[in-house]
Structures are given as C-alpha cells and as structure tokens.
Amino acid sequence: YLQVFHLDTGKQLRQLSEGMKVKFQLALALSHGAKLLILDEPSSGLDPVSRAELKDIFRQLAAKGAAILFSTHITTDLLDCADDITYIQKGHIVASKPMADFLADHPDCDSLEDIMVRLEKEDITL
C-alpha cells in the first residue's frame, strides 16, 4: 500500500506532510489484510486524487469480502462507497438502513447533503 499511496519509503514519519501522514496510517492499517476495518474520518486531510485512490481501494477490498466501517462528514464519500448508512446524532442512532432506503425516506431533499443538513437542524427526540 505504500506504492499505492505514492509514499517515499526513505522518509521518516516526522518528515511527512499531514496528508502524507494520513496516507501512511491508512497504508499501515490496510497492510494487515483485515476482514473488518473501522476507520474514523479516513479521507480527512487527503487531496482529491488521494481520496479517489482511497475509495478505489475500499471498493476493491469490499469486492474481496472485507467490511469497512467508517465515519465521515463528506457525503460524496458515502455515496461513492457506502452500501448502508447509520446516522448518529448526539450519541443516538437516528437511522440505520441501506443507502437506497435512507435516500428514499427523504424524497423532498435533492441530495444526501441536504438530508444531513435537515437532520442536523431537526430536534430529534428518541
């Protein structure tokens, strides 16, 4: 994965930019061949090319049977990668369902981002 993310193996971690550190940490996590990856904001700090590479890797891993659970505020990452979505607000699960069902539940919204903005503005009581 070092080659996939175009990381220089001759550099020490302290010599890397913040974006390169994120790539290094992801390469390390992916190198174990785990069947389940749990990642917090994995595309945070990545440039658009690196984000696209990461999403390609996620799709390849999922095609090989891996499960990837990740948190994000970037709705395009969800649309590009997620089969299912769990929406959490104030520590409570508000919705957990297939992406298509989640989108269908909000026909008056034009996009996933619109849904997220609306849900954040609503006072949801459980």
Where are these regions (language model features)?
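Hydrophobic anchor residue at the start of the ABC signature
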Residues: 26
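Helical segment within the ABC ATPase nucleotide-binding domain
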Residues: 51-64
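Conserved H-loop
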Residues: 66-74
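A short, surface-exposed alpha-helical micro-motif characterized by mixed small hydrophobic
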Residues: 78-80
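ABC ATPase "signature
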Residues: 96-97
